[in-house]
Amino acid sequence: MQVSIACTEHNLKSRNGEDRLLSKQSSTAPNVVNAARAKFRTVAIIARSLGTFTPQHHISLKESTAKQTGMKYRNLGKSGLRVSCLGLGTWVTFGGQISDEVAERLMTIAYESGVNLFDTAEVYAAGKAEVILGSIIKKKGWRRSSLVITTKLYWGGKAETERGLSRKHIIEGLKGSLQRLQLEYVDVVFANRPDSNTPMEEIVRAMTHVINQGMAMYWGTSRWSAMEIMEAYSVARQFNMIPPVCEQAEYHLFQREKVEVQLPELYHKIGVGAMTWSPLACGIISGKYGNGVPESSRASLKCYQWLKERIVSEEGRKQQNKLKDLSPIAERLGCTLPQLAVAWCLRNEGVSSVLLGSSTPEQLIENLGAIQVLPKMTSHVVNEIDNILRNKPYSKKDYRS
């Protein structure tokens, strides 16, 4: 657009010369000359009008803020899809830790706060999370066009053909998800992990097929390496198919390298954005584990023994000490430690959206408050945090320089 305007402005400057040329030709082709002049004037008028609003439009494409809720919206990668910078995830909670009534309350709070992104997966609570999410959307009567619904495929069932990223499971798995969600399509379908048993061309062809069939608008990856994402993009370009637009990756104060080093390079090269999850590191950054593992916490559950071991390990104790050192920064900014952690994730402009996981309305409201903390995340504050964490990743280019 900028190039077109620049060329048009150049044409406007040389308009007198063109008029003289047209006047010389007018004796032989008056109709052609008049048509050319009319077309030129139309282009000039359009160029002037575009010149007045293009800069503002360019800014809004990067980030915009809803006046009523204060929610910020960003593009998902280099696609045109606008997503709220905070989304609501359903892992563990929907169909598991919380009741259907609490799930409805959480979705209502999120929606009324400006959240338009809701993420789920076929494997969450064995499909029940999708059922609950779809039922709430239908009950609330929210306009489908106002929502961005994403789901993930890989673990669909116990049968050998009900998992993986074969063409069969991608198509059948997405059909099953749509039935549970009671939706005609999802906005983004994610490959929930890489599949070494399926050729990349088959995966990309299947994702392109479900998009062409109207079952999804875009497709993305989750837990894929940069090399695997690049391979998918190359295959898509080679065979004129649709490449992925986004990678779902874990990102928090103690997990940084992929989102801060690998994905930015992919974004600039092929336009793949980042949708991140677990901003509180499965609750480790919430502050509840500073004095051990409470009985009512997620880490106390039998199926989360790995989380408990992680917390009580030597590395876990070091992380808790670092969180204590971060608390004064949060107090100075007038926020809680979880709000600081979420705002820290949002300060990364390469992150399109951060998925929140909450089991109570109070937790969700607190985490949504990170939007108000984001303007306070100055370079000085970020440097303070880096000095405490001492885990800032660097690319090979940085080391060479």
From Swiss-Prot:
Q: In which tissues is it expressed?
A: Detected in brain. Detected in hippocampus, in the middle third of the molecular layer of the dentate gyrus and in the mossy fiber zone of the CA3 region. Detected in globus pallidus and pars reticulata of the substantia nigra (at protein level). Specifically expressed in the nervous system. Detected in mesenteric arteries.
Any one Pfam family match given in the protein's UniProt record, by short name: Aldo_ket_red
Relate the protein's function as given in its record.
Answer: Regulatory subunit of the voltage-gated potassium (Kv) channels composed of pore-forming and potassium-conducting alpha subunits and of regulatory beta subunits. The beta-1/KCNAB1 cytoplasmic subunit mediates closure of delayed rectifier potassium channels by physically obstructing the pore via its N-terminal domain and increases the speed of channel closure for other family members. Promotes the inactivation of KCNA1, KCNA2, KCNA4, KCNA5 and KCNA6 alpha subunit-containing channels.
Q: What's written under domain?
A: The N-terminal domain of the beta subunit mediates closure of delayed rectifier potassium channels by physically obstructing the pore.
Q: How does it assemble?
A: Homotetramer. Interaction with tetrameric potassium channel alpha subunits gives rise to a heterooctamer. Identified in potassium channel complexes containing KCNA1, KCNA2, KCNA4, KCNA5, KCNA6, KCNAB1 and KCNAB2. Part of a complex containing KCNA1, KCNA4 and LGI1; interaction with LGI1 inhibits down-regulation of KCNA1 channel activity. Interacts with the dimer formed by GNB1 and GNG2; this enhances KCNA1 binding. Interacts with SQSTM1.
GO terms of biological process kind = diaphragm development; heart development; learning or memory; myoblast differentiation; regulation of delayed rectifier potassium channel activity; regulation of potassium ion transmembrane transport; skeletal muscle tissue development
- What lineage does the source organism belong to? Eukaryota, Metazoa, Chordata, Craniata, Vertebrata
Q: Disulfide pairs?
A: none
Per its UniProt record, what CDD domains does this chain match?
Answer: AKR_KCAB1B_AKR6A3-like
Q: Which organism is it from?
A: Rattus norvegicus
Record EC number: 1.1.1.-
Q: What is its main location?
A: cytoplasm
UniProt name for this protein: Voltage-gated potassium channel subunit beta-1
The residues that the entry says bind NADP(+) are: 90-91, 97, 119, 192, 222-223, 248, 277-282, 288, 298, 357, 359, 363, 366-367
Catalytic reactions of this protein:
a primary alcohol + NADP(+) = an aldehyde + NADPH + H(+); a secondary alcohol + NADP(+) = a ketone + NADPH + H(+)
Q: Which GO terms describe its molecular function?
A: aldo-keto reductase (NADPH) activity; carbonyl reductase (NADPH) activity; molecular function inhibitor activity; NADPH binding; potassium channel regulator activity; protein domain specific binding; transmembrane transporter binding; voltage-gated potassium channel activity
Name the encoding gene, please. Answer: Kcnab1
Q: Which domain of life is it from?
A: Eukaryota
What's the protein's topology in the membrane? Answer: Peripheral membrane protein
Query: What protein family is recorded?
Result: Belongs to the shaker potassium channel beta subunit family.
Sorted alphabetically, the keyword list is: Cell membrane, Cytoplasm, Ion transport, Membrane, NADP, Oxidoreductase, Potassium, Potassium transport, Transport
Active site residues of this protein:
Y124
Question: Does this entry carry the keyword Translocase?
Answer: no
From the Swiss-Prot or TrEMBL record, state where the protein is found: Cytoplasm; Membrane; Cell membrane
The cellular component terms of Gene Ontology attached to this UniProt record, alphabetical and capped at eight, are: axon; cytoplasmic side of plasma membrane; cytosol; dendrite cytoplasm; juxtaparanode region of axon; neuronal cell body; perikaryon; potassium channel complex
